[in-house]
């Protein structure tokens, strides 16, 4: 939360493994950039270890990319590459690894302008109706969580409690302020 409270924007640059707490730290930044490096891997694999994301991942990821996509990432624990993370909305840009320094500086200059910041926000909020249908009201969250629970039970037969607990945490806290969740 200290990172979020800084009086200036922050940028997380992801070039390699960004899993678990690393992604949760990146999610606390204002902007995220990933490289197209084949070793770039972004995800929350905690459920594969029998635990749930504990440093804000269950709160920040659904707010950023929407509940259905976040549930898919969190409940499976499977990481994605930089391009897929961009497509999902986890990162704001994906840059070639060999030109990362130049492209990151270019992105920083871009978001200094009001037009650049607005373009990033428009991309993040490009589907407000879909977000409302799946997460921005209590009934939508309940329906989305019930569908996810049904799919999870089919897949795991209830033998893996961590994904079920992660789902429960998200379902109970997503409508609350970030600090309360």
Regions from the language model: what does each represent?
Residues 1-15, 52, 57-60, 64:
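An acidic, glycine-rich surface segment that forms the CoA-thioester-binding/catalytic face
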Residues 4-6, 34-38, 64, 68:
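Secondary-structure transition/capping motifs at alpha-helix termini
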Residues 9-12, 19, 32-33, 37:
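Active-site cavity-forming subdomains of large catalytic enzyme subunits
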Residues 13-19, 73-79:
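Glycine-rich beta-to-alpha transition loops that act as phosphate-gripper elements at the mouths
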Residues 19-27, 54:
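Short glycine/serine/threonine-rich phosphate/pyrophosphate-binding segments
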Residues 24-28, 74-180:
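Amphipathic alpha-helical segments at domain termini/boundaries
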Residues 29-54, 91-104:
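Gly/Pro- and small hydrophobic-enriched strand-loop and loop-to-helix capping segments
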Residues 61, 69-75:
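Short helix- or helix-capping micro-motifs
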């Amino acid at each position: 939360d200290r990172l979020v409270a800084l009086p200036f924007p922050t940028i997380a640059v992801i070039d390699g493994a960004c899993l678990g707490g690393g992604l949760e730290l990146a999610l606390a930044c204002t902007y995220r950039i990933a490289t197209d490096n084949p070793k770039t891997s972004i995800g929350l694999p905690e459920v594969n270890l029998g635990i749930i994301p504990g440093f804000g991942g269950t709160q920040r990821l659904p707010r950023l990319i929407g509940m259905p996509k976040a549930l898919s990432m969190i409940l499976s624990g499977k990481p994605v590459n930089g391009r897929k993370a961009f497509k999902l909305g986890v990162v704001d840009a994906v840059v070639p690894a060999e030109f990362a320094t130049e492209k990151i500086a270019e992105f920083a200059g871009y978001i200094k302008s009001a037009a650049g910041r607005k373009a990033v926000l428009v991309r993040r909020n490009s589907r407000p109706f879909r977000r409302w249908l799946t997460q921005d009201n209590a009934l939508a969250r309940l329906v989305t969580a019930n569908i996810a629970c049904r799919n999870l039970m089919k897949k795991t037969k209830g033998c893996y409690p961590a994904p079920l607990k992660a789902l429960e945490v998200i379902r109970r806290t997503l409508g609350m302020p970030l600090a309360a969740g």
